[in-house]
């Protein structure tokens, strides 16, 4: 009997490459004293886990591994919690498979 190998999403994401624009991040989080419900939701729903609650209780982003899927844009841009732009040409995610 042949053993079944389960592929993990982390292994697939590891294959992608990123060219990070350190001078101009494509996503910024609005300064806030306490995070809104939509910002807190981003810590759970971002497929690349780019959002996290920092040591002072604010939601911060590390966009280095961003997949540019737009999930955060749909959830939080209209409320003004984040500002989202496409990365400048040549920067951003470089997908390995497609």
From Swiss-Prot:
Keywords from the named record: Electron transport, Iron, Iron-sulfur, Metal-binding, Nitrogen fixation, Plasmid, Transport
Keyword Electron transport among UniProt keywords: yes
InterPro entries hit by this protein: ETF-QO/FixX_C, Fd_FixX
Keyword Nuclease: no
GO biological process, any: nitrogen fixation
Domain of life from the UniProt record: Bacteria
GO MF annotation terms: iron ion binding; iron-sulfur cluster binding
Coiled coil: none
PANTHER family reported in the protein's UniProt record: FERREDOXIN-LIKE (PTHR43082), FERREDOXIN-LIKE PROTEIN YDIT (PTHR43082:SF3)
Family named by the database record: To ferredoxins from P.putida and C.tartarivorum, ferredoxin I from A.vinelandii, ferredoxin II from D.desulfuricans.
Function: Could be a 3Fe-4S cluster-containing protein.
Protein name according to UniProt: Ferredoxin-like protein
């Amino acid at each position: 009997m042949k053993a079944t190998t389960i592929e993990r999403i982390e292994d697939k994401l590891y294959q992608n490459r990123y060219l990070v624009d350190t001078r101009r991040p494509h996503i910024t989080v609005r300064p806030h004293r306490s995070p809104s419900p939509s910002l807190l939701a981003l810590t759970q729903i971002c497929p690349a886990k780019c959002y996290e609650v920092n040591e002072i209780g604010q939601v911060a982003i590390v966009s280095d591994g961003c997949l540019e899927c737009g999930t955060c844009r749909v959830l939080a841009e209209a409320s003004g919690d984040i500002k989202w732009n496409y990365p400048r040409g040549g920067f951003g995610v470089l997908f390995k498979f497609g």
